[in-house]
Amino acid sequence: MAIYAIRSEFLKKTSEIAVSWFSVLNAFFVITLASSVSKIWSSKYNPSVAFKYGFGLFFVALGYLVVWFGAKGLSEDMKISMAYIILIYFFHTIGELFISPVGLSYVSKLVPHRMLAFMFGTWYLGIAIAQKVAATLGGQVVSITKEYGLSTFFLIFAGIAAGAGILVMLYNPVLKKLMHEVK
């Protein structure tokens, strides 16, 4: 059934790939890249948690920069190449692999055992709040696009992610001190 649907879609003169088809990319990149990232953390190149977070945020910024570049000069009726969409998923997934497992690991290492379930819930509540903020900011795309262009919208997010990455890395000594040598 799926083969028939794909075949009939691509035999048309003009073909359009549904956005929903790209949702599999995150899972694909997690499965294919997780072991490589894990190998980095278990080798001699195991940076501190702040640097892992910072690098993860830099990869998120890089993903937004790719889309910023792809969206430069596009008018409203034009569509971006799927290569840019694949690249943003690639870089954001690497960023996710640098941030999410490390964050969960350090929640379990740093929180007193009696508060562990509560803090994991707080971690996921933070993710839910971030999703709500992202939806609210995403609603601003029309007003920003009208005034500055679509590429500027992505450039703003790249700047925020890169700035947060720099900030986290600058606070590395403070975070190490607060973690009391937990590795």
Identify what each model region corresponds to:
Residues 2-3, 55-77:
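C-terminal ends and interior cores of transmembrane alpha-helices
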Residues 16-17, 82-83, 108, 113-122:
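Loop-to-transmembrane helix entry/capping segments in MFS-fold secondary transporters
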Residues 23-30, 120-135:
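Glycine-rich segments within core transmembrane alpha-helices of 12-TM secondary carriers
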Residues 40-41, 137-147:
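Interfacial helix-cap and linker-helix signal at transmembrane-aqueous boundaries
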Residues 42-60:
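Cytoplasmic membrane-interface "Motif A"-like loop-to-helix N-cap segments
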Residues 55-58, 148-173:
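Symmetry-related core transmembrane helices of the 12-TM Major Facilitator Superfamily/SLC fold
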Residues 65-69, 128-141, 170:
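A gly/Pro-rich, aromatic-decorated transmembrane alpha-helix motif that marks the paired
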Residues 89, 93, 97-112:
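Intracellular juxtamembrane helix-capping segments at the cytosolic ends
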